[in-house]
Amino acid sequence: MNASHLSRPPLTIRRISLDTGRENVAVISRRSRALRADVFRGFSRVALRINTKVLLATLMITDDDAMIGPDELGLSEPAFRRFNEPVGSAVSVSPAQPPASLDAVRAKIQGHTLTPAEITAVIDDVAHFRYSDMEIAAFLISAARFTSTDELLALVDAMASVGTRLKWQNPIVVDKHCIGGIPGNRTTMIVVPIVAAQGLMIPKTSSRAITSPAGTADTMEVLARVDLDVEQMKRVVTTCGGCLIWGGHVNLSPADDILISVERPLSLDTPEQMVASIMSKKLAAGSTRLLIDFPVGPSAKIASASEAMRLRKLFEFVGDHFGIAVEVVTTDGRQPIGRGIGPVLEARDVMAVLGNEPNAPADLREKSLRLAAHLLEYDPLLRGGAGYARAKELLDSGAALKKMQQIIDAQGPSVCNSELGSHAADVLAPADGVVNGIDCLRINRLARTAGAPIVKGAGIDLFKKIGDRVDQGEPIYRIYASDRSELDLAIAAAEAESGFSVNHHSPAAVEPVS
């Protein structure tokens, strides 16, 4: 870098209380002597340097001296945390050189197949925030056109290697994953304590919701801490045989979260990208046995058996290459599983099943038992075919509930507000008849409109499922919100399209709950 391009004089770091998501943002005053119009422009990429430490950031220019003085450089919260230098430190600023790995992205755009070294370079730069969202999008779109099996294997390996790689002494480390898309469906929080109660190791890391009303981490956070670091996670697993934590805090496949944040707005979800995302995290987690749940249904991610078969073979191919035994089960994805949709409501359902309460959702209980049965079959001390009976025994006896409480105590108490939303409205059946369809995507959107998952107590409580008979005006589900304006938005959305079909009628009336 030409020395004349460095900021002269150096600027001093100032921390700005500005959440810019995953983006590193640096703010400079328009009156700064370091600002050169021919070099620095708003939204350009810059390199911040202190000795040998370098951070890439997006530059923004302000006219507000109260925000940033002429001799200061403001760092957004993410940038300040990643740079990890104290306020007042002298920092130089220069235009950022484009990452060399962009040559590989250009080659991929032109239809070339990338080498493992090229893919590793791209993923390393993505994980270290050297790519803009536009550059990430270019890579993802070019890969969506065609990804060879060799490229897929290299992508999984690179994504797993760039972050934390967990290693366990146990020869059998079981794991479970659902590809998502079904409201509720909080089986993981029931399967983990059942499997751990059997004595199998199941260190479960889960994601937060991106487009759904709750992820497993969001729901578990109602009951316990989920933001454990690697050493804390290992202590919990050593004590309990399992855990239920947020994967983002232990840095498993960090590039995946960055790629997903760009994929979702573009509606990019190819089989190869899905497999790379899931398998990189399982490889990084040290899993040796993996059960994957494929819900199949008209509004699920997989709509047909043929789609499920192709995706299953892709998962098995990658698993075989990396020494992970992959088992795929297809399940009913026509409707939500359980009654609650949203963190607090889903946590209620989970604890009702674990506590063997008479009003516990039967579908959530049964699906959890069947999934747990598959994992228990990996226990060499259990007779073949005895998995389901043993899972049921562990649940019915209270052993699974006891194990869940041990995990909760080991992870630490929740600091979240676990109260149900104080504002509610019932969505009413549009006609007499039978519920003959539920749009999972629509129900998810309605629960998010009500405030979930950011507001833990927001969401939807289902009263009816497919096949249930209803009378006109009878409540079919209740919307909860913590803010009246969010409830009003959800009511308007439900009146336009409730997500329920009764005798092929979907418009519904909505009645506030006093």
Swiss-Prot record:
Belongs to the thymidine/pyrimidine-nucleoside phosphorylase family. Type 2 subfamily. It catalyses: thymidine + phosphate = 2-deoxy-alpha-D-ribose 1-phosphate + thymine. One of its GO terms (biological process) is pyrimidine nucleobase metabolic process. NCBIfam families: ARCH_P_rylase, PRK04350.1. GO terms for cellular component: cytosol. One of its GO terms (molecular function) is 1,4-alpha-oligoglucan phosphorylase activity. Keywords: Glycosyltransferase, Transferase. Its EC number is 2.4.2.4. It is an enzyme of class 2 (transferase). It holds the Pfam family PYNP_C. It comes from Rhodopseudomonas palustris (strain BisB5). This is Putative thymidine phosphorylase. PANTHER family: THYMIDINE PHOSPHORYLASE.
